Amino acid sequence: MKCSIITPIGPGHEQLFLQCRNSVNKAITQSMGPFTEITHRPIDDTQGLKGRSASRNSEVAEAVAHGADWIFFLDADDLIIIDAFEKVMDAVKHYDAIWGAICELKKGAYYPQIRDEQDVPIRNVEDVILMDPFFSLQMGHFVKAEVALANPFNVELNTGEDFDYYLRIWHKYSCVKLKVPIFINRRGMHSKGPKSASGTDWRRNVEEIVRRFKREKQIQLNK
């Protein structure tokens, strides 16, 4: 199986991407897990004109055209965990998309930590909706290439596009959130381009996206 790692490089992330790329190279050297070929596909958007969503979408199409079976979405300011590929050895046989526990490296810290309040399992889209989005899912994840191609990111959204995508994937496909991390989210490193947004903007948009999704899909929650 072939896996393509897709990384948009936004304004100010050029140096951070070098560290991101280094983490990918180390992980590949450590173990390719279930994959016979792993390629890293960065997208240069350092002018910030294209945006994360359009960058990811175009590169997914390129990856599929080159025979990718799986995609790993990794932001330029984040790091893949060295044994990430090993950790999904079994999961790729059973799921269409695979997330891990949220692990973060705070600005100025030396060591990453698992984010608190992740004890409640995520089993379905209802669980995603019920959970505070800060503690549920993040961008670094594996997804079957055909699933990613069929579910592009919404290019009209400058923030919250991640959660819009998560909801669609968890609603339609077999997904899992592992109890172990597969990437490290580096806090306080956000890009500052024309399509960037603050954490407050993100939460406000995500809450509206969740409300709209529940209404459109007529999802009834038990809690």
What are these regions (language model features)?
Residues 7-28:
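Short, well-formed alpha-helical segments that are part of the catalytic scaffolds
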Residues 123-143:
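A recurrent flexible, glycine/aromatic-enriched loop bordering the glycosyltransferase active site
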